[in-house]
């Protein structure tokens, strides 16, 4: 629904400035986290690769030190864009983690999250076609593609009008995503304890 509204809005813009993805947002690549393994008994973070973007954090998820740059630490609500391998986007909702290479954390100090999220999403299918054309290497896009990916920026009044519509709905979507993930984690913990016999069902009152 939000995507349709966004597409309809940009299709009907009358006055706008032509820009690019790289000018409306910062695309920060993750690190090769195998170089930042936690030391014994050191606090650590789960490492987010494309598998974790799609399937979530599991007991097989790698860990990294917390001693990494803030730019590659992700938190709930952050926009992620996998630009190599299986190109995809998501809004993160699984807690604090370390971002692995081949995934961008997308941020902006100038434009709202919904704006750069949907503009990046608009170009995703084209990015996938570019990546699919790289037959001799793992499919990916180059950073230069962000520089030539067209973005239409409306006059500020129009942007603010749309912001009043999009922001509450987008925030609700993110909050629901995070709540669903929290409930899923609680369910998995309880199921694990139940399977191990750590929960006595006879003592549970319904």
Regions found by a protein language model. Name each.
Residues 1-32, 53, 152, 156-201:
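Non-catalytic DNA-recognition/assembly elements of restriction-modification systems
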Residues 15, 41-44:
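A short, polar/charged loop/turn motif at coil->beta-strand junctions and beta-hairpin connectors
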Residues 22-37, 44-76, 98-99:
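Sequence-specific dsDNA recognition surfaces
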Residues 49, 69-125, 130-136, 142:
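A short beta-sheet element
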Residues 137, 149-150:
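Residues marking the start of alpha-helices
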């Amino acid at each position: 629904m939000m995507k349709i509204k966004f597409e309809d809005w940009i299709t009907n813009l009358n006055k706008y400035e032509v820009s690019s993805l790289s000018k409306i947002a910062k695309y920060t690549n993750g690190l090769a986290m195998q170089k930042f393994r936690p030391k014994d008994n050191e606090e650590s973070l789960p490492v987010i690769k494309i598998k974790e973007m799609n399937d979530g954090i599991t007991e097989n998820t790698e860990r990294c030190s917390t001693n990494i740059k803030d730019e590659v630490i992700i938190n709930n609500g952050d926009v992620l864009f996998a630009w190599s391998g299986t190109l995809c986007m998501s809004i993160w909702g699984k807690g604090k983690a370390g971002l692995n290479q081949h995934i961008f954390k997308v941020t902006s100090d100038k434009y709202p999250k919904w704006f750069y999220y949907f503009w990046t999403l608009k170009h995703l299918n084209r990015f996938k076609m570019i990546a699919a054309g790289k037959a001799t290497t793992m499919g990916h896009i180059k950073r230069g593609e962000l520089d030539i990916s067209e973005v239409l920026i409306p006059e500020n009044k129009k942007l603010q009008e749309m912001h009043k519509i999009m922001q509450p709905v987008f925030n609700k979507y993110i909050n629901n995503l995070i709540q669903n993930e929290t409930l899923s984690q609680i369910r998995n913990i309880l199921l694990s304890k139940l399977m191990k016999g750590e929960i006595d069902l006879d003592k549970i009152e319904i």
